[in-house]
């Protein structure tokens, strides 16, 4: 379950930000997670609650913003939305696609005190 490792990294990032920006508590975390990032959101929520215990983010609200997956279609030469990596191009039916959006995870913002 790599979601626990993601939560550990998130905790470290928040602790570093707290030292650099002089805050002591995080009350809300907004994460943007791409459809192709390979993150199970429910497992991430569970891991977040466990990993944040005893930290500056204990009890913080986790808000997940799900980003659409997109890919470049080499057959019709454009970026198209995809529900899964295995879907054909919704415009031309082509299968020569390379994901170019919705592949990552980003901390959008933190609500702090």
Curated annotation (Swiss-Prot):
Q: Which organism is it from?
A: Azorhizobium caulinodans (strain ATCC 43989 / DSM 5975 / JCM 20966 / LMG 6465 / NBRC 14845 / NCIMB 13405 / ORS 571)
Q: What Pfam families does the annotation carry?
A: HypA
* Binding of Zn(2+), residues: 73, 76, 89, 92
* Function text: Involved in the maturation of [NiFe] hydrogenases. Required for nickel insertion into the metal center of the hydrogenase.
Name of protein: Hydrogenase maturation factor HypA
Q: What UniProt keywords are attached to this protein's entry?
A: Metal-binding, Nickel, Zinc
Q: Name one GO molecular function term.
A: zinc ion binding
Q: Does the keyword Metal-binding apply?
A: yes
Q: Which superkingdom does the taxonomy of this entry point to?
A: Bacteria
Which InterPro entries does this UniProt record tie to the protein?
HypA/HybF
Is this entry keyworded Disulfide bond?
Answer: no
- What GO biological process terms are annotated to this protein in UniProt? protein maturation; protein modification process
Task: Report the sequence similarity comment from the record.
Answer: Belongs to the HypA/HybF family.
């Amino acid at each position: 379950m790599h979601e626990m490792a993601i939560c550990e990294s998130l905790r470290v990032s928040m602790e570093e930000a707290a030292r650099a920006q002089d805050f002591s508590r995080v009350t809300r975390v907004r994460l943007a997670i791409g459809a192709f990032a390979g993150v199970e959101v429910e497992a991430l929520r569970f891991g977040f609650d466990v990993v944040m215990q005893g930290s500056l983010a204990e009890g913080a609200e986790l808000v997940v913003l799900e980003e659409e997956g997109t890919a470049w279609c080499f057959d019709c030469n454009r970026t198209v939305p995809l529900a899964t990596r295995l879907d054909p191009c919704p415009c031309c039916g082509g299968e020569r696609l390379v994901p170019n959006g919705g592949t990552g995870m980003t901390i959008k913002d933190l609500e702090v005190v």
